[in-house]
From Swiss-Prot:
Belongs to the RRF family. Pfam families: RRF (PF01765). CDD domains: RRF. GO terms for cellular component: cytoplasm. NCBIfam families: frr (TIGR00496). GO terms for molecular function: ribosomal large subunit binding. It comes from Listeria monocytogenes serovar 1/2a (strain ATCC BAA-679 / EGD-e). The keyword Ligase does not apply. Responsible for the release of ribosomes from messenger RNA at the termination of protein biosynthesis. May increase the efficiency of translation by recycling ribosomes from one round of translation to another. Keywords: Cytoplasm, Protein biosynthesis. InterPro entries: Ribosome_recyc_fac, Ribosome_recyc_fac_dom, RRF_sf. This is Ribosome-recycling factor. It is found in: Cytoplasm. Its main location: cytoplasm.
Amino acid sequence: MSKEVLSKSKEKMEKAEQALTRQLGTIRAGRANASLLDRLSVDYYGAATPVNQMASISVPEARMLLITPYDKTILGEIEKAILKSDLGLTPNNDGSVLRLSIPQLTEERRKELVKEVKKEAEEAKVAVRNIRREANEELKKLEKNGDITEDDLRSYGEDVQKLTDESIKNIDSITKDKEAEILEV
């Protein structure tokens, strides 16, 4: 039972790390990356549809995204969605594809992005700490019910703390890598 608590906690912590990685992937770091458009949705026949489900997104050059819609009639809608988004990019529509040139980031914008990265990382750390708290509460319930001894409680508590420390170390590493990518000129 207590091993289940540990494995569930580890799984949840890994999911928090993966969520952070996905979230940071959508932050523009000066290089073209198809995941920049992951959060972008377009109104398609009355339903909000992600751009990556209605178009092929490729990276022909280091600072360019090429969006080729499967249905050419939706090209204008995708263009409007990009202009309305907080990406700060201006699409170039040539009738069949959209080209997104990704400009160099200014020093000021880089600092804003680093702040955003740190905020996302802190949210991930809070999630991991909440998972630790939940695991410790479950272990205390098990001890109270007589399923594990007090010594087991302490031992499993230490294991949960090790998982937490490892997860936070991974989050710090992910964050550091993203910050380096953003600050790279």
